[in-house]
């Protein structure tokens, strides 16, 4: 896949923002923008990182292949470690046909306190997955500092028979320092399109008008950590497959029941959702890893192989 092909893919999947842009100040021309665009192809050497274009302090190391050459493990690096006022990060991964890519991060992402002018801190992740390919998006948690003003968008575009497993773990405030997210503004969007059709749309807005959601039982139930895991699409047309999916969901629910958190599992259309609320982001991550170990072989018939960086 060459740069021209990457550009064509990006233009093909260009969508309007998940979140209305009128709600927060826009990024001005004087603010810092960084981007990373990755292109993956299938060759005789397996899944290879064919192109890597970037601007600013956002890049990746060479791929790792702990599972063999067909699956590339990618570590996404952002040396500043977080977003300050006016930052805009755009991460794009274009997967050509028959590729398998797992992307993770070496540490937590951070969105720091905004300046007094409350200029937007914005991150867009766009994952374009071609036919018969798999994208695993498994970053570490994102910490939203009190008084951050941020918009975080995840856009996933799946072609025919493409698969996705991903999660996001968000820490509101600094609970270890007894600092909650009493001030600030956060918007999160998670969207999956399958062959151009919208299949999943999740949206969360935290501002002064909705801050009661933190304490509400139907909201975050007093927990500062909010985790969401999504996997699919699963084939529900075959009766035997449906039975095995029921067994998978039952097993995932047992993991949630044994976990000291407010967690649950649901099947929405062709996608499995795992949600978790907790006081400890590491506990949510461990629950999601347990679920991933079962979801992965059920979805793609391949056992889990944890990125080595998770053990450091």
Curated annotation (Swiss-Prot):
Major location (coarse): cytoplasm
Compartments it resides in: Cytoplasm
Keyword Cytoplasm recorded: yes
Transmembrane segments: none
GO molecular function list: nickel cation binding
Keywords for the protein's UniProt record, in alphabetical order: Chaperone, Cytoplasm, Nickel insertion
One cellular component term from this protein's GO annotations in UniProt: cytoplasm
InterPro entries found in the cross-reference section: UreD
Pfam families attached to this UniProt entry: UreD
Superkingdom, taxonomy of origin: Bacteria
Family: Belongs to the UreD family.
Record's function text: Required for maturation of urease via the functional incorporation of the urease nickel metallocenter.
Subunit structure and binding partners: UreD, UreF and UreG form a complex that acts as a GTP-hydrolysis-dependent molecular chaperone, activating the urease apoprotein by helping to assemble the nickel containing metallocenter of UreC. The UreE protein probably delivers the nickel.
Alphabetized PANTHER family for the sequence: UREASE ACCESSORY PROTEIN D
Protein name according to UniProt: Urease accessory protein UreD
Name of the coding gene: ureD
């Amino acid at each position: 896949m060459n740069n021209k092909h990457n550009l064509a893919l990006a233009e093909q999947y260009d969508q309007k923002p998940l979140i209305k842009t009128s709600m927060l100040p826009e990024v001005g021309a004087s603010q810092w923008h960084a981007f990373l665009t990755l292109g993956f192809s299938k060759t005789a050497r397996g899944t290879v990182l064919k192109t890597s274009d970037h601007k600013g302090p956002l890049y990746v190391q060479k791929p790792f292949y702990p599972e063999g050459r067909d699956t590339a493990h990618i570590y996404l690096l952002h040396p500043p470690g977080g977003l300050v006022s006016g930052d805009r990060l755009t991460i794009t991964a274009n997967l050509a046909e028959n590729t398998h890519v797992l992307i993770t991060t070496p540490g937590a992402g951070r969105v720091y306190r905004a300046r007094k002018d409350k200029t937007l801190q914005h991150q867009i992740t766009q994952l374009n997955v071609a036919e018969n390919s798999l994208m695993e998006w498994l970053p570490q948690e994102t910490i939203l500092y009190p008084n951050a003003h941020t918009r975080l968008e995840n856009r996933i575009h799946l072609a025919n028979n493409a698969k996705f497993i991903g999660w996001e773990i968000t820490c509101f405030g600094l609970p270890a320092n007894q600092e909650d997210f009493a001030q600030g503004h956060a918007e999160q969007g998670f969207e999956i399109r399958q062959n151009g059709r919208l299949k999943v749309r999740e949206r969360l807005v935290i501002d002064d008008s909705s801050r009661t959601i933190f304490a509400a039982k139907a909201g975050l139930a007093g927990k500062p950590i909010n985790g969401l895991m999504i996997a699919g699409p699963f084939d529900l047309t075959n009766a035997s497959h449906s039975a095995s999916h029921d067994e998978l969901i039952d097993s995932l629910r047992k993991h949630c029941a044994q976990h000291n958190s407010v967690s649950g599992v649901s099947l929405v259309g062709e996608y499995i959702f795992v949600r978790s609320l907790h006081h400890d982001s590491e506990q949510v991550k461990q629950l999601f890893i347990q679920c991933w170990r079962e979801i992965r072989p059920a979805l793609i018939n391949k056992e889990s192989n944890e990125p080595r960086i998770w053990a450091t």
